[in-house]
Amino acid sequence: MPETIQGRLLHVQERIRAAAARAGRDPSSVTLVSVSKTMPVEVIRQALEAGVTILGENRVQEAADKIAELPGRAVWHLVGHLQTNKAKQAVQLFALIHSVDSIKLAQTLDRHGREARKRVRCLVEVNLGGEGSKSGTKEADTQALLAAARDLPNLQVEGLMAIPPFLPSPEEVRPYFRRLRALRDHLQGEGFRLPELSMGMTHDFEVAIEEGATLVRIGTAIFGPRPA
């Protein structure tokens, strides 16, 4: 792994290009979300100077503190679980929320979007592994959630997101990425417009790109090991 953030970023960008090429895709169809959770502002500032433009955070309050210190420097995405009591602040802070996992949360975001006169862009998080420790709607419930969201005028669902089980080999994760894409394709056949697939992290993003990811969420490969 290169020693500097700039070197690591260039290396990740090259790996994204290579994975897209293997899949016969235009590299520009893949958006890099650099996940800065737990990273101090000084380190994030280095990443911005190196060319990072989109930052992903897991926690609303942590993001709020960082955004206050880095106003106007980046576009921010929420990639972690969102509680309904944090929804109002999330609407104000984030350009895209990756983790809508219930009708209740969708309705809450819609209400706060109306109050803020903002169309809230989001993705529906699907729990592909059926893991109780992870958030996300069940695969079987995804269409009902999308149908409910379609009736909410201040909510714009743009695709699906998933965090598959962590498995030793990226190839073992491939079937989960394939399933998310197949689910998206099925739902598009049912009339939902879902251009975005947020899937793939440091461990497995190349496989995710080969399977159709349009947003990859990469932290360690850019920022290095997280602080203890």
Residue ranges and their predicted role:
Residues 1-203, 209-211, 225:
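Conserved alpha/beta-domain cores
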Residues 213-228:
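Gly/Pro- and small hydrophobic-enriched strand-loop and loop-to-helix capping segments
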